[in-house]
């Protein structure tokens, strides 16, 4: 007859609380991280990164959009409403933004519509802040169907190159050194920011532990830790 599991083994087997359960259990305001995915992706792509940030004590709130044909501005309007909702939530003390790819451009446009009073730091992973050379190649074929493709070209007249950047916000950018969609140079915004490049592909950033470590460090300090060249 097998021994009954003791308290330690029962605790180990207990599932981790959900973000909403932790919100109700914790006294005091949370540091909330709003996660926004990129083009042709979904919130599940952010699950690993969100889990790693949850374990560091943040309350992650993935925000997604399904219609990839809509303009970035349509998604930005919807995301600005989410920011306003979080801003009014008494359980939320700070609203950090962590985005991947086009999600960063949606967040930039949303902040032009609504800037939360509780706005914290802004980390962008592989953002096409100056446009994407892949969008340049695809715009003739896909631009008429998928509006974001035309809005993300490197043209000086494209939407992405006409958007502003939020002022007085700590901005950190993590680029992918082997990115076939967005060059490291194109990830840089035209405002003061911290920047680091990891040797990986565009979407791999979301699954790397070192990328999550960098995100968490920037959210905590407003800086990326020094890294040994090549690592």
Regions found by a protein language model. Give the residues of each.
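Serine-dependent carboxylesterase/thioesterase catalytic core
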Residues: 28-29, 33-44, 48, 52-66, ...
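Hydrophobic alpha-helical segments, principally membrane-spanning helices and signal/leader peptides
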Residues: 17, 22-23, 105, 111, ...
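C-terminal catalytic-base region of ester-bond hydrolases, centering on the histidine
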Residues: 166-231
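Alpha/beta-hydrolase fold catalytic core
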Residues: 1-31, 47, 54-55, 226-231
């Amino acid at each position: 007859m097998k021994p009954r599991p003791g308290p330690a083994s029962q605790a180990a087997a207990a599932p981790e609380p959900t973000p909403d359960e932790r919100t109700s259990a914790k006294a005091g305001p949370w540091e909330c991280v709003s996660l926004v995915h990129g083009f042709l992706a979904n919130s599940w792509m952010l699950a690993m990164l969100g889990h790693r940030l949850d374990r560091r004590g943040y309350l992650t709130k993935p925000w997604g959009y399904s219609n990839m044909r809509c303009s970035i501005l349509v998604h930005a309007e919807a995301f600005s409403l989410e920011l306003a909702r979080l801003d009014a939530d008494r359980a939320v003390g700070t609203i950090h933004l962590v985005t991947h790819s086009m999600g960063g451009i949606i967040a930039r446009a949303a902040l032009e519509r609504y800037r939360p009073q509780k706005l914290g730091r802004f980390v962008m992973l592989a953002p096409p802040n100056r446009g994407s050379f892949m969008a340049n190649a695809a715009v003739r074929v896909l631009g008429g169907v998928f509006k974001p493709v035309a809005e993300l070209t490197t043209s000086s007249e494209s939407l992405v190159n006409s958007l502003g950047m939020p002022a007085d916000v700590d901005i950190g950018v993590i680029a992918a050194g082997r990115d076939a969609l967005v060059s490291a140079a194109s990830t840089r915004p035209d405002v003061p920011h911290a920047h680091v490049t990891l040797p990986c592909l565009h979407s791999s950033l979301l699954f790397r532990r070192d990328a999550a470590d960098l995100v968490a460090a920037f959210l905590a300090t407003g800086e990326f830790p020094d890294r040994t060249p090549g690592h």
